[in-house]
Amino acid sequence: MTGSKNKARAQAKLEKRASAQAKAAAEREAANAGRGAGKNRDKGKGKAGSKTDAVAEAKAGSKSKVVAETKEGARPESKAVAKGTSDFNHKAENKYARSARKDKPSSDSWFWAGEDSGINSWFWKGEEVSNNSVAKCENKPSTSIQARVEEHTPRTSHKSRSGAEEEEEENVIGNWFWEGDDTGFDSDPKPVFKIVKPQPVDEINEKDRPKDWSEVTIWPKAPAVTPAVLGYRSQDSSEGRPSSYIVLASNEEETSTTCTKNTRSSLQPIPEYPFGSDPCIQTLDEIRQQIKIREENGIKPFACPCKMECYLDSPEFEKLVNILKSTTDPLIHKIAQIAMGIHKVHPFAQEFINEVGVVTLIESLLSFSSPEVSIKKAVITLNSSGDDRQQMVEFHVKHMCKETVSFPLNSPGQQSGLKIIGQLTTESVHHYIVVSYFSELFHLLSQGNRKTRNLVLKVFLNMSENPKAARDMINMKALAALKLIFNQKEAKANLVSAVAIFINIKEHIRKGSIVVVDHLSYNTLTAIFREVKGIIERM
C-alpha cells in the first residue's frame, strides 16, 4: 500500500514536471520566433523564463533522484525517453513529450541539454546582439532546428564573427588613418633642394692682354685725391711725366691746383697704393712746421694716424726737397714719402731707408737712374783706365763721409753712413780720404750714443791697421776720446775695439813704422798707454 502511494506520488510529480517542461518548450519556441523577427526585448524575457524554469526543475529533479535510483530497470527506458525528448525538441510535438517525460533520467538529460543550449546561447546571443550580428538571421526561416544548431555552436560563431569584427575595425581605422595621411601630405612630393647662385667669373678679354713685356706696367695710375708727394711742377713736364707722378704743392699753389684735382677726380678711379700704404694729404709747409715743433719741443705732433715716425731734420728736409725738384721719377718720390713718414709701410722698409740715408739713397739712384748713364757706367767699368775708376771711387767715399757727418747726431742716416764707411775702410786705398774727417769722427765718438760709438770704433780699428792712418790718430784729442771708452758702463764690444786700436798703435811704434820725434809727445803718449793699461787690468 505504501509502495503504491509512493508510486502515485512519483507519477504525479513526473506529470507536473512534464507540464512544466512543455510550458518551458513553448516559451522557448516563442522566444526563438521573437528573435527571428528582431524583437530583442521579448527574447531576453524568454531566455530569463527558460533559465528560471530550468533551475526549478533541477531542484525538483534532485529531490526525486533518490526514488528513481531504486528502479534499476528504468535505465534502458531512460535512454528511449531521452531520445524521445530530443525528437520532441526538434519536432515540437506535445504527445511525444508527455510520454517521454515520465522517467526521471530524462529530466536530467533535458536539464543539461537545456542548460547547454539555453545559458550558452543566451550568453553568446547577447554578445552577438551587441555586435550587431542579428541581421544575418532575419533573411532565414525561423525554425527551431536552425535555432538549436546556432545554440549548440556558439563558440565557433563567436570566433568567426569576432575575426570579422576585427577586420572591420582594422579597415575603418586604416582607411581613416591613410585618408588623413593622404590629405595631409602630397602623394607626389617634389624634391627639396638649395639653389646655389654661381659666383660671377670675370672673363679675360684676349684683346686687352699685353702682347709684350714692354706693355706691362708695375706702378698704378694716379689716384683721384692727390696724396702728399714731393716734386716740382714744371710747366713743360706735365705731358712727359709718368701716370704715377703726383705733385705736392705749397700753400700758394694749393688754391691754383684745386680745380685741376676736382677735374681729375671725376675721370680717374682711386687705385691701391704700392707697399701696402695709405695716402696722407699734407703740404710742404705743414711738414716743415711739424719738423720745427719736433726740434724745438722734442715731440712728434703728427695729427694723422696713418703717419709714421719721421727722422728728418730741417736741413735734411730742405736738401731732400731741392733734390726732388729736379726729378720726376715715381720711385724716388715714393722713397721720399716713406722717409718723411707720409706713407705707412712695413717697419722694415722705413728702417732700411733711414739706415741707408734717404738723401744718399736718392742721390745714388739719380746717379744711375737713366739707361744712358747705366750704359755709360758699364762702358767705363769695362774699357776705362784705372784712373777713371779710381776717381769714381774717391768721389763716392768723399760723398759718404760728407753725408755722414752732416746728419744729426745718433740719427739713423748717420749710423747707416758709418756702416758704409766701415765697409769702405776695409781697403787701405781709401784711408787717406777718411783721414780728412777724423776730427768729425772723434767728435761723434765722444758725443754719440753706444751704437754710434760702436760704428765709429769699427772705422778707427780698420784704419789703425794702416801705419799712415794710425800716425794721424796719435794726438791728444784722439787719445783722450779713446781713453773715455774705458769705463764700467761701456759695452764689451766697444771695449774690445778700443783695446785693439791701442794694441795696433803700440805695435806700429815698436816696429818703427811710426816714429815720434817730439819728446813731449812721446812722454804724453807713454803716460796715456800706461793709464789705459792700468784701467784694463782693473776692469
UniProtKB/Swiss-Prot annotation:
User: Which cell locations does it reside in?
Assistant: Cytoplasm; Nucleus
Sorted keywords for this record are:
Cytoplasm, Nucleus
Q: Where is this region: Disordered?
A: 1-111, 132-170
One Gene Ontology BP term is:
positive regulation of neurogenesis
Q: Where is the composition biased (Basic residues)?
A: 1-10
The organism's superkingdom is given as: Eukaryota
UniProt main location, coarse: cytoplasm
Q: Name one GO molecular function term.
A: protein homodimerization activity
Q: Name one GO cellular component term.
A: nucleus
Query: Which Pfam families does this UniProt record tie to the protein?
Result: Arm_2
Question: Per the record, where are the segments of Polar residues compositional bias?
Answer: 132-146
Compositionally biased tracts (Basic and acidic residues) = 66-80, 88-106
Protein family according to the UniProt entry: Belongs to the GPRASP family.
Q: What does this protein do?
A: Survival and differentiation promoting protein that plays a role in the regulation of neurosynaptogenesis. Induces phosphatase PP2A activity which results in APP dephosphorylation and inhibits BACE1-mediated processing of APP.
Subunit and interaction comment = Homodimer.
Protein name stated in the entry? G protein-coupled receptor associated sorting protein 3
User: What gene codes for this chain?
Assistant: Gprasp3
